[in-house]
């Protein structure tokens, strides 16, 4: 929430006028909300038919790891933004997201290389969630404009490093990376 607040405050300052952090966060039309689908999925493993499930810590860990690996790279790249305020937010956010990455990676390894059950559940969660990461690399017009202005990052330039982080953790966790392909 702290990272989002800093970004909303920056945008409100840049827009000026009656625009406030709260207006940006809470008073937008539905189509103005943006988020990766991965982050909106329930915190349980894959289901089929009318099955129901309780929350699954492994699913939460897999999701946090995949997203934190991206955000660590993104904040690191944004430290070089031409917008000094955004660069400062990135520097502060990078410290926090590195902690999240370390925490989720450690737990991913514990669960993946743990008991047969924790391994199987972690692999099932990875198989279920991984295809949604393809959305990370879908280029948007807003991203292109930010890159052109020198304030943003082309996320596709981060993919090789993200792949390396993910592959190293999965190898240590004895988990298999799902086949390429996704839902984008």
Predicted regions and their residues:
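Conserved alpha-helical segments that form or flank metal/cofactor-binding pockets of metalloenzymes
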Residues: 1-30, 107
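Alpha-helical scaffold segments in carbohydrate-active enzymes
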Residues: 2-10, 92-110, 125-135
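Inter-helical turn/loop segments and adjacent helix faces that build the functional surface
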Residues: 14-15, 74-92, 106-121, 139-150
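Acidic/His metal-coordination segments adjacent to aromatic residues that form catalytic metal sites
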Residues: 26-63, 111-115, 129-148
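Internal, conserved structured core segments that host functional sites
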Residues: 38-103
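C-terminal intrinsically disordered extensions
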Residues: 81-91, 98, 110, 167-184
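Extended, helix-rich structural scaffolds rather than catalytic motifs
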Residues: 120-184
């Amino acid at each position: 929430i702290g990272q989002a607040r800093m970004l909303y405050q920056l945008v409100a300052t840049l827009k000026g006028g009656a625009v406030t952090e709260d207006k940006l966060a809470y008073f937008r039309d539905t189509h103005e909300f943006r988020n990766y689908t991965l982050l909106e999925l329930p915190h349980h493993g894959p289901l089929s038919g009318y099955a129901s499930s309780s929350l699954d810590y492994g699913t939460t860990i897999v999701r946090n790891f995949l997203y934190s690996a991206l955000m660590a790279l993104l904040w690191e790249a944004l430290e070089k933004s031409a917008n000094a305020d955004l660069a400062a937010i990135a520097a502060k956010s990078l410290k926090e997201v590195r902690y999240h990455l370390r925490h989720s990676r450690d737990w991913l390894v514990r669960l993946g290389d743990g008991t047969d059950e924790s391994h199987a559940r972690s692999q099932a969660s990875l198989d279920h969630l991984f295809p949604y990461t393809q959305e990370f690399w879908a280029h948007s017009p807003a991203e292109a404009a930010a890159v052109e202005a020198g304030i943003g990052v082309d996320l596709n330039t981060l993919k090789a490093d993200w792949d390396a982080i993910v592959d190293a953790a999965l190898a240590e966790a004895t988990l298999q990376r799902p086949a390429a392909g996704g839902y984008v």
